[in-house]
Amino acid sequence: MPATQKPMRYGHTEGHTEVCFDDSGSYIVTCGSDGDVRMWEDLDDDDPKSVNVGEKAFSCALKNGKLVTAVSNNTVQVYTFPEGVPDGILTRFTTNANHVVFNGAGNKIAAGSSDFLVKVVDVMDNSQQQTFRGHDAPVLSLSFDPKDIFLASASCDGTVRVWNISDQTCAVSWPVLQKSNDVVNAKSICRLAWQPKAGKLLAVPVEKSVKLYRRETWSNPFDLSDSSISQTLNIVTWSPCGQYLAAGAINGLIVVWNVETKDCMERVKHEKGYAICGLAWHPTCSRICYTDVEGNLGVLENVCDLSGKVSSNKVSSRVEKDYNDLFDGDDTSSAGDFLNDNAVEIPSFSKGIINEDDDNDDIMLAADHDLGDDENSVDVTMLKADLSHKEEGDDDQARSIHNLPLIRPQRPFYDGPMPTPRQKPFQSSSTPLHLSHRFMVWNSVGIIRCYNDDQDSAIDVEFHDTSIHHATHLLNAFNYTMGTLSHEAILLACESADELASKLHCLHFSSWDSSKEWMVDMPQNEDIEAICLGLGWAAAATTALLLRLFTIGGVQKEVFCLPGPVVSMAGHGEQLCIVYHRGTGFDGDQCLGVQLLELGRKKNQVLHGDPLPLTRKSYLTWLGFSAEGTPCYVDSEGCVRMLNRGLGNTWTPVCNIREHCKGKSDHYWVVGIHENPQQLRCIPCKGSRFPPTLPRPAVAILSFKLPYCQTSTEKGQMEEQFWHSVLFHNYLDYLAKNGYDYEESIKNQAVKEQQELLMKMLALSCKLEREFRCVELADLMTQNAVHLAIKYASRSRKLILAQKLSELAAEKAAELAETQSEEEKEEDFREKLNAGYSHTTTEWSRPRVRSQVEDAEDREDTVSEEKPESHNHGQNLFQSANSSDTPALKSGAVFSSSQGWVNPFKVVVSSKEPAVSANSTRSANILDSMNKSSRKSTSLNRMENNEKSPVIKPLTPKPRSKQASAASYFQKRTPQADKTEEVKENPKSSSSDAPAVCLQNSENQRPKTGFQMWLEENRSQILSDNPDISDETDIIKEGMIRFRVLSAEERKAWTNKAKGETASDGAEAKKRKRVVSEICETENQEETVKENLDLSKKQKALNLPANQKLSAFAFKQ
């Protein structure tokens, strides 16, 4: 029957850990790097007795009620067992003692230290000491000869020595080990051991085998090895009978041999692959205890038979029952008789083979009482004879074993995937319960410490910001083990005791009334396992697989079932995150699930029990939210993961804490995560997983790094930076979706940073001739950045790339228009707006503006032909257009206020034609295929009309604010501006236009900057890309953003261009270098229209029909 491996449990903090049994095997004694010696009644002992012996305990030995320890203060101390009372110091060294062992009688101990010395000390009289000198490096391990004649030692100098105790001389030395300068750097601690009783063999672990040296001759008759051993062996130990030898490797493998037959009897692998550093065989039972370098304790049951004989035990009653059930109703069959009659005669190895094979041939052979002469057969009479010989004494043991036929090794036994022990529930940012001084929680609000001494049991609460609440001291009368903290309350919980129910205790310090605490008892047989706080609510998960919700004032709310036992919980605002066991994990992996709920007015479940990703063979160590409300968690391998709401609520690794640790045994204890600024707040723990309460630990800040490939290259770095920025600004979309306030500048800065990175990656791909990759990068850009990419491709002479990018820009524009139309269909407010008294054109009525303008043009012609001119300057000739059926147009759009003449061609020339031609010019024949939607064109027309109205209407100038004055610098030059210059040159112009003319001229005389010229050049492009912009200030802001994206050379060229420009419009027109001939023709037509308009003003004596004919002619142009 193969050995049974029990689930390991936490024993000590990370570091070298040793284990031994007492003389009777009633106690398991362990010591570790936390300086404690613990006495376990068995592996399931939840409350082992603990004795602190120093800062670190390197080794321990137990014999005759004396417990000897080697500790970090360079001493070897003795304690009474099991009381743990100090009984003096046996010896001292100048450095740490690395190993200490008892002799067989228990009256002497041997200790080896890093100062190269080995000492043998009498336990009763420590003045009786012997010192052995000869090693040239720290001593690794020691072992007493059972007859107290020899002492074996291993050292970092690479030698194994055997000393004669009586004269303190070296009998023999073997240079078989790898040299090192210190114990911590040694590849193996080489825990050697003498064979019990006679001490005929000395076992030494060397590389991947165990060398056995014969006593006194010091020869090496044979080595023990196995094909399953792939790493260096660390330690060996003998069974009490001396027949079996167990060895542990640095990769967690435990192997057991039969020394006489050299057969490998057992192969057991550590569940997590940690190095085995402690092995101890039970004095009487077939049990081995072992420890690893992580401080864990494990047990192997049913290892081998310790009688020193080949097993001849009967088949167990359980196996008999199983076979009887199999042949139920056929008790008199030959198979049943065979099992009852011959069970005694079947050896263990034959039994294993029979049980292992399910073929019918084996059953037939067994029924015939004929095992045959195969290679695994054993004659029963010979076996009985050999067993009788073995009972004669220990000296005949080897001879009787050799008389047995040679048995070949059994084939490896595979147990299948091993289930992983379930992780126990825990509170995030808390330290283990067994510590007398521990943190119950450390978060962004404050700290809760728990002190559980023999004299005092109390809880201290400290707030980082004392304006929230002052520090609080509480008596821990109910033995609270769980605690959490928020800006509103302190929440504590305890498990049930003998007669006390499990309690939930809340101190609501933010309450405005005088009652500031409440308490709730759980039902019988229901214990609280995890708690958390949110905004206005508290939650508790219990052993009954229930989650109970409470208001912060103590009102019970919803109660719902959990799909499995809870592991941990966290709350933030209205969000509640629960991690629980979905099932049983295998091969060291945990099987966890996660639920994310929103507990606001509209309750919602975001994650429906999805599997929680963990690193292989790891467990959950921290669960919480970032300060901005994004769920995060950390596993035992140091991987920090964050919920990516932008990718279907998946989990993305954002940091590996282990990369920041300097030492192998160092860790970081996470206390909080921030997305803005991007900080991982944690406490460094030197040589342990948890920080001490005193002195107060300092918080360190780690940076985030996504695990992208080739981050040493420029491409990999920019890719990591881009997705890093995208991931860590997803919370802004979540805040906006849920109606929270946030700074718009943060999002704008993030978008700008992302677009700059995309442009850099596109430029890099362009240089590397990766044009297809350029298009892929452009697909991630915004509409404005795509236009910049098109310009870059054109200047780089990548014409095919520019064409592909143009097609992509057209697709993006079509998608944007489609999205806008869908939004308009879903939220159509036109009927609601038109039902009221206001007929102001809004963004919801934009598609109707074009038809309204066309209707107004038709009415203009009708009015100008039918009605005679009236010289009443206050009369509006478009009054018929403002009927109840048609909404009014923007004031000042199509009439002159100085003479009262109707200007029928203003809408056509100034609104429609320049808008189309300007856009066609800016695209430089690249975006010719893009069609403008009616919404964009009408928005542009409305914007240009708004810009012209201050010039056309003769209003008295008012004092301007600084913002308005600055905005006037960036006004686009329009035909109306040219008109005012003509009025200035003509002294016969009407005096009513003088204020506007003076104001416009004073603004035009100011020196222009490069940005102003660039904005005039690209104004139409900005308006076409952003149809929703209606304010001049917004146009300037958008222009400034685009101007900053330009390279330094381009900005400098615009500045030089502005310095060399003259004030005249003719020179300005020449410097702009218009390319398209259609624009020139349009400008000529505009000049002709202006001359005709001036002519109509001068000839006031002309009759009305002539003016009407002139107006009709100009309209047709």
From Swiss-Prot:
Amino acid composition bias (Basic and acidic residues), ranges on this chain: 861-872, 975-987
Biological process annotations from GO: DNA-templated DNA replication; pericentric heterochromatin organization; regulation of chromosome organization; RNA processing
Pfam families: Ctf4_C, HMG_WDHD1, Mcl1_mid, WD40_WDHD1_1st
UniProt modified residues of type Phosphoserine: 333, 377, 821, 910, 923, 1030
Modification sites for N6-acetyllysine: 664, 953
WD repeat windows: 11-50, 52-91, 93-131, 134-173, 184-223, 228-267, 271-310
Location of cross-link Glycyl lysine isopeptide (Lys-Gly) (interchain with G-Cter in SUMO1): 1116
SUPFAM superfamilies: HMG-box, WD40 repeat-like
Location(s), subcellular: Nucleus, Nucleoplasm
A cellular-component GO term for this protein: nucleoplasm
Keyword set, alphabetical order: Acetylation, DNA-binding, Isopeptide bond, Nucleus, Phosphoprotein, Repeat, Ubl conjugation, WD repeat
Sequence position, cross-link Glycyl lysine isopeptide (Lys-Gly) (interchain with G-Cter in SUMO2): 390, 1116
UniProt GO molecular function: chromatin binding; DNA binding; RNA binding; RNA polymerase binding
Sequence segments annotated as region (Disordered): 816-885, 911-1005, 1054-1074
Residues recorded with modification Phosphothreonine: 819
Family annotation (Gene3D superfamilies): High mobility group box domain, YVTN repeat-like/Quinoprotein amine dehydrogenase
PANTHER family in alphabetical order: WD REPEAT AND HMG-BOX DNA BINDING PROTEIN, WD REPEAT AND HMG-BOX DNA-BINDING PROTEIN 1
Record text on subunit structure and interactions: Trimer. Interacts with the polymerase alpha catalytic subunit POLA1. Interacts with MCM10. Interacts with DNA2. Interacts with CDC45 and GINS2 subunit of GINS complex; these interactions associate WDHD1 with the CMG helicase complex.
Role description: Core replisome component that acts as a replication initiation factor. Binds directly to the CMG complex and functions as a hub to recruit additional proteins to the replication fork.
Protein name: WD repeat and HMG-box DNA-binding protein 1
Source organism of this protein record: Mus musculus (Mouse)
Gene: Wdhd1
